Amino acid sequence: MGDESETAVKPPAPPLPQMMEGNGNGHEHCSDCENEEDNSYNRGGLSPANDTGAKKKKKKQKKKKEKGSETDSAQDQPVKMNSLPAERIQEIQKAIELFSVGQGPAKTMEEASKRSYQFWDTQPVPKLGEVVNTHGPVEPDKDNIRQEPYTLPQGFTWDALDLGDRGVLKELYTLLNENYVEDDDNMFRFDYSPEFLLWALRPPGWLPQWHCGVRVVSSRKLVGFISAIPANIHIYDTEKKMVEINFLCVHKKLRSKRVAPVLIREITRRVHLEGIFQAVYTAGVVLPKPVGTCRYWHRSLNPRKLIEVKFSHLSRNMTMQRTMKLYRLPETPKTAGLRPMEKKDIPVVHQLLSRYLKQFHLTPVMSQEEVEHWFYPQENIIDTFVVENANGEVTDFLSFYTLPSTIMNHPTHKSLKAAYSFYNVHTQTPLLDLMSDALVLAKMKGFDVFNALDLMENKTFLEKLKFGIGDGNNLQYYLYNWKCPSMGAEKVGLVLQ
């Protein structure tokens, strides 16, 4: 990272954003506004499977450390405030406040209940402890929307990224690859490929101004990004035009410069200009106020490698050989008529998906064009397989997307190839059989692990197919400027990349 970003002039105290402070999909790491230092929150999909107590010791040590920090900060409090400039006093008070509420973002509702959310208390979202029984916007749509962009810290400038330019796409890939979501132990980091980013960021209706970048003025280096994509969302009995907020990322060396809140305010302004006032996003941290909470589960496909890179561990009384045998899969799928999705299947996949999602409370409402974009197979991005019966009718389909993770500091293995369950629809084939075949197909394609959230009907097959619950954070689902009762994971029917 060039000197420009390190030496950029300190920004003025950030104004409280008026905006859709969501960030999506962990993607969707919004609590930067409360604690800028921890910009990359774990969405849950990276965390090792929970089959050992090996981390308990670490947690104890961490707690001790935090206790020490709190004590130290308390001792530091009697500074001669009146001998310092007002700006410096504010900084010290802010630091003391951070220590007093505990280090880092809240991972559980219990932790969150002890935090104060000064930023989120100004936003159109329900309060954490609020019991919501109504449905509708928190505040009405705005008529007069700010026309000029928000002010960035000195030395930085806005740039709407043209992802059709391979050089720009590569810059975004590099920013995310080096600074985006890591697991809590800094062992794995999402590795979104340039092609995957085009798939995730350019669905039907995408707008270039919603690919919102921040550059260093002098070097033109890309140091920040946030995105929005359009989506029709069905929430309980209402269908609403929203955006999905995603890929909030700030370069590690800029985490103290309060860039993230400005990014979120700016994407909100740009979305408001298009007449959209609601958003959906996910995060691995607890903010006011989750509408649903899901958890990642992991199914070993290549147990030896997963153990070698410490993604999972040998259970007590288990040898490597017995573990390999436990997770062994058939050589080929067993469902008759299972084949890759073709162009001719788009209308029937659209129909099957639309019908299936009606049973859930939070779902996308996709057009046929969107179904083509999100489900038509692309190598190393999205795989969809349909089941065609003897009469030539497509009755079921399964899908998973590809999202590898970089393995940090391992002498042999550099990448972990992970498949993520997307949408799976069954009318004739039992879901258990369909997902068993999904595992076989993923194994055949060289994946190391198959990840799935416990949403929709997924709980019915997770344990039976030998998935293990992740030991990472929950994935929280949020709505911006929309109030509704919260729901169980089994009623969430929305998967964000």
Curated annotation (Swiss-Prot):
Residue numbers bearing the Phosphoserine modification: 31, 47, 83
Gene Ontology MF, one: glycylpeptide N-tetradecanoyltransferase activity
Protein's organism: Bos taurus
Parts forming coiled coils: none
InterPro entries per the UniProt record, alphabetical: Acyl_CoA_acyltransferase, NMT, NMT_C, NMT_CS, NMT_N
Protein's GO biological process: N-terminal peptidyl-glycine N-myristoylation; protein localization to membrane
Gene3D superfamilies: 3.40.630.170
Protein name: Glycylpeptide N-tetradecanoyltransferase 1
Class of this enzyme: transferase
Membrane topology label: Peripheral membrane protein
Protein's cellular compartments: Cytoplasm; Cytoplasm, Cytosol; Membrane
Subunit structure: May be associated with other proteins.
Tagged with keyword Acyltransferase: yes
Ranges of compositional bias, category Basic residues: 55-66
Disordered as annotated region, ranges: 1-82
Keyword terms: Acyltransferase, Cytoplasm, Membrane, Phosphoprotein, Transferase
Recorded name of the encoding gene: NMT1
Xref: CDD domains: NAT_SF (cd04301)
Family statement drawn from the similarity comment of this UniProt entry: Belongs to the NMT family.
Reactions this protein catalyses: N-terminal glycyl-[protein] + tetradecanoyl-CoA = N-tetradecanoylglycyl-[protein] + CoA + H(+)
EC number(s) from the headed UniProt entry: 2.3.1.97
Function: Adds a myristoyl group to the N-terminal glycine residue of certain cellular and viral proteins.
Keyword Acyltransferase: yes
